[in-house]
Amino acid sequence: MSIHIAAQQGEIADKILLPGDPLRAKFIAENFLEDAVCFNEVRNMFGYTGTYKGHRVSVMGTGMGMPSISIYARELIVDYGVKKLIRVGTAGSLNEDVHVRELVLAQAAATNSNIIRNDWPQYDFPQIASFDLLDKAYHIAKDLGMTTHVGNVLSSDVFYSNYFEKNIELGKWGVKAVEMEAAALYYLAAQHHVDALAIMTISDSLVNPEEDTTAEERQNTFTDMMKVGLETLIAEA
């Protein structure tokens, strides 16, 4: 067991999906995995291991924000030996061409957080996805006919930002969306030499406010990113 995860050694697969919402983890386990067994209920951050198309895969919630995903991702990597981690979550569009329910694959993540600068105050350390996972996810999504955007995202420490207009300005520089976890996940992956990718469904738009989704939709639908994430985890080189 680790401090925040109750699993015993061997109960977590070396490939894992990481939704922020623990109820989304439960949904994925119940609807996509066979013979799913719950390995964690600590703080109601549900985690499950089962099989997907014959491959052993885990799924676990991470909560909201970079501090939270940093705790769970680090323990999964260091204490349980996870090698491939794919975040599946929601994001807000910063770009006129990126619409609600479409997918964004984060090739890199800018951030306004100090979580990385605390380690590297003299550098702007780049947070980038595993190219292997990114390449596989892109081709899988396209083959499945899903509208998919690849580009940079903003990982923000603040949901209710006082810099709303500056965030929107990033969209004009090609940043596709804003979310709250990818940069920290990519940083941990670089530190520990594992593979990570963030796949997001656009749940709302900062540039087209009339585009929106409900909390129930965000929890129980958005299945395209789940399919792409699972297919990417089991794809052979």
Swiss-Prot record:
It is an enzyme of class 2 (transferase). Catalyzes the reversible phosphorolytic breakdown of the N-glycosidic bond in the beta-(deoxy)ribonucleoside molecules, with the formation of the corresponding free purine bases and pentose-1-phosphate. The record marks 218 as: Important for catalytic activity. Homohexamer; trimer of homodimers. Signal peptide: none annotated. It catalyses: a purine D-ribonucleoside + phosphate = a purine nucleobase + alpha-D-ribose 1-phosphate; a purine 2'-deoxy-D-ribonucleoside + phosphate = a purine nucleobase + 2-deoxy-alpha-D-ribose 1-phosphate. The active site is at residue 204. One of its GO terms (biological process) is purine nucleoside catabolic process. One of its GO terms (molecular function) is purine-nucleoside phosphorylase activity. One of its GO terms (cellular component) is cytosol. A purine D-ribonucleoside binds at residues 4, 179-181, 203-204. NCBIfam families: deoD, PRK05819.1. The keyword Glycosyltransferase applies. The gene is deoD. Keywords: Glycosyltransferase, Transferase. Belongs to the PNP/UDP phosphorylase family. This is Purine nucleoside phosphorylase DeoD-type. PANTHER family: FI09636P-RELATED (PTHR43691:SF11), URIDINE PHOSPHORYLASE (PTHR43691).
